[in-house]
């Protein structure tokens, strides 16, 4: 086996990337998330492929084709709910992965970090387009509201929206192109993941201390392959519990009603993994301002390496920065909660405060705290 893995040219690339890759000996379970994301992506592509064989991207039949998958296709309901809840697992892993990068200073690998941000945008776009495909009420109105935000762009906005819609409203053309892009994007994401890993393997992995560990390295296989299997078992257990016990827990009941352009649902909201960004969007009364804030809520990750003022890379020995990090996590959870609430008196104010907090923690408080910690440590 050893000889075969080393000799064939293609096998050699795979062996170098996944088996013999030297990894730091101190990496905790927070470093499992990368492989879990890879598994989530594979699972989504496989279940999505099987679903696409039975789905029709036509406004007249889309809703019925999804019903047909759940009722008539062998284990179609398992495929459908694994795909829908697999997206939730994907985003849980994604947000934890980004959080790990923030906490341990992995953003100092700027190429890997920037490709990661592009990947995050690509996955979010894919998930949004996938949500439109069942053509339920929330699919239709979610697509209408979110694509309509582009009309806030000065001068070209209206033309741009009509170009994306393929008409004067979300209709057959929109659904067909969303299906085409939803099918295509995961393969583009897979290619970008390879580039992400390529840049990561140029520098080697970070570790919890944030100190270079070139002196103490171990092979990826068998140590981290075995360690990753634990995370895999946990995520599969979570996913299967969701799929088999409460498959609709994270979905919206409105999506069980066929799309009706004449009847607007009382509360239009996206899936739970977009609620924090949706809350930031809604907290600004101006349309263009809201769109800018929405994009910046993710794009702000790109300037985090520039805001790193600490002499230490990781937060593991910086208690004040740790407090701010967990405050940021609590703030994001608050935003997620607010995004799912109606636009009423207490929620509007809480959402605005949480949005201000989100940006001020990242842009102002974290860099200042890092400088203060440097001073306290006499550096």
UniProtKB/Swiss-Prot annotation:
Heme b b562 binds at residues 83, 182. One of its GO terms (cellular component) is mitochondrial inner membrane. Disulfide bonds: none annotated. Its cofactor is heme b. Heme b b566 binds at residues 97, 196. The keyword Transit peptide does not apply. It holds the Pfam family Cytochrom_B_C. A ubiquinone binds at residue 201. It is found in: Mitochondrion inner membrane. The cytochrome bc1 complex contains 11 subunits: 3 respiratory subunits (MT-CYB, CYC1 and UQCRFS1), 2 core proteins (UQCRC1 and UQCRC2) and 6 low-molecular weight proteins (UQCRH/QCR6, UQCRB/QCR7, UQCRQ/QCR8, UQCR10/QCR9, UQCR11/QCR10 and a cleavage product of UQCRFS1). This cytochrome bc1 complex then forms a dimer. Component of the ubiquinol-cytochrome c reductase complex (complex III or cytochrome b-c1 complex) that is part of the mitochondrial respiratory chain. The b-c1 complex mediates electron transfer from ubiquinol to cytochrome c. Contributes to the generation of a proton gradient across the mitochondrial membrane that is then used for ATP synthesis. Heme 1 (or BL or b562) is low-potential and absorbs at about 562 nm, and heme 2 (or BH or b566) is high-potential and absorbs at about 566 nm. This is Cytochrome b. It comes from Myotis bocagii.
